[in-house]
Amino acid sequence: MSMFLDTAKIKVKAGNGGDGMVAFRREKYVPNGGPWGGDGGRGGNVVFVVDEGLRTLMDFRYNRHFKADSGEKGMTKGMHGRGAEDLRVRVPQGTTVRDAETGKVLTDLIEHGQEFIVAHGGRGGRGNIRFATPKNPAPEISENGEPGQERELQLELKILADVGLVGFPSVGKSTLLSVITSAKPKIGAYHFTTIVPNLGMVRTQSGESFAVADLPGLIEGASQGVGLGTQFLRHIERTRVILHIIDMSASEGRDPYEDYLAINKELESYNLRLMERPQIIVANKMDMPESQENLEDFKKKLAENYDEFEELPAIFPISGLTKQGLATLLDATAELLDKTPEFLLYDESDMEEEAYYGFDEEEKAFEISRDDDATWVLSGEKLMKLFNMTNFDRDESVMKFARQLRGMGVDEALRARGAKDGDLVRIGKFEFEFVD
């Protein structure tokens, strides 16, 4: 395939928060100076930024890993570590971002300058100045920085065009685009000449302008991936008006009306919302001898399949070769665009809600399993977050972590599972003895 890349899978890692510091104030004439360790800085976010100058996802073919910087550690004198700069990654307009693991749509990036945080940096760990209490005025406790969010993302690029040209291969879509715009698509008398979307700007005689995309040729079964399949259909999702190009000369030996039905069936099979878009039927190649007779037959069959109260789709006879009927077609297209709103690609329920970084009540705080060597293994998102933020170089921090586990009910749950005094318990690579 050509150098157009419309999907990519990448990994992003936000920066970790900086570690908090344990320090004490030691100055002349300041007795009992107390704790003086500052907090760590926030880790950098990974932020996607829409750049209208980009046209493909090609950059992500060569660079698939994006990692933001971590925050600085806390310092003495109660000074906080510096927060890290966000890592800003440029993406083209029309990029849909999904979580690769769940398939959930995170965001749809369509406006120049639009930003979205795809991975949140961890907060800085607290220094010992934060843990001072009347009972413990000089704590030797600090927190490690919170790990930054890490995830795998699936990117899809759907080109931004107001009007999409659809039709069987070799019905004249590329020729039409080259005539009505300054685009220079590859044109040839064989199927799938167009293997990537071509985009061009149209200016009508009345001065209105809109973007037109000549999309890869569609065949029956495309919605199931046949031919160029869903690569084609992905791009038509963003168009507001569809120009359905029909070869009225039947030069390929197919019936024009059967072509019309087959293409609409594929659009409906892929996504029912594609059929909500207004469609203009473009009867192309009207300069050929058989075309007029075929057009009359087409109109007759079309009318037979609509009841008397339904409005028939507009049909515009044209010739991309001789430019017959083009001005009328473009004016009608511009008029239809003016009264057609944009279509949402995804229901709001499919989009990721505003990020929430607490712990849900239903979410298990921890899980217990047992290894083959009889070691009890603790896991779970909340537990691992507390574990990763514990400074095991300080006894008071370790004791604080033990109290947190007890408060979560870990001791009680281990006892209920049959843990005995002296049994080994493992969290990550850290092991300790269970004390009953």
Swiss-Prot record:
An essential GTPase which binds GTP, GDP and possibly (p)ppGpp with moderate affinity, with high nucleotide exchange rates and a fairly low GTP hydrolysis rate. Plays a role in control of the cell cycle, stress response, ribosome biogenesis and in those bacteria that undergo differentiation, in morphogenesis control. Its EC number is 3.6.5.-. GTP binds at residues 167-174, 192-196, 214-217, 284-287, 319-321. Monomer. GO terms for cellular component: cytoplasm. PANTHER family: DEVELOPMENTALLY REGULATED GTP-BINDING PROTEIN-RELATED (PTHR11702), MITOCHONDRIAL RIBOSOME-ASSOCIATED GTPASE 2 (PTHR11702:SF31). It comes from the Bacteria. Its main location: cytoplasm. GO terms for biological process: ribosome biogenesis. It is found in: Cytoplasm. Keywords: Cytoplasm, GTP-binding, Hydrolase, Magnesium, Metal-binding, Nucleotide-binding. Belongs to the TRAFAC class OBG-HflX-like GTPase superfamily. OBG GTPase family. PROSITE patterns: G_OBG, GTP1_OBG, OBG, OCT. The gene is obg. GO terms for molecular function: GTP binding; GTPase activity; magnesium ion binding. It holds the Pfam family GTP1_OBG. It is an enzyme of class 3 (hydrolase). The lineage of its organism: Bacteria, Bacillati, Bacillota, Bacilli, Lactobacillales. Residues 161-338 form the OBG-type G domain. This is GTPase Obg. Mg(2+) binds at S174, T194. The keyword Signal does not apply. Its cofactor is Mg(2+). Residues 2-160 form the Obg domain. It comes from Streptococcus pneumoniae (strain CGSP14).
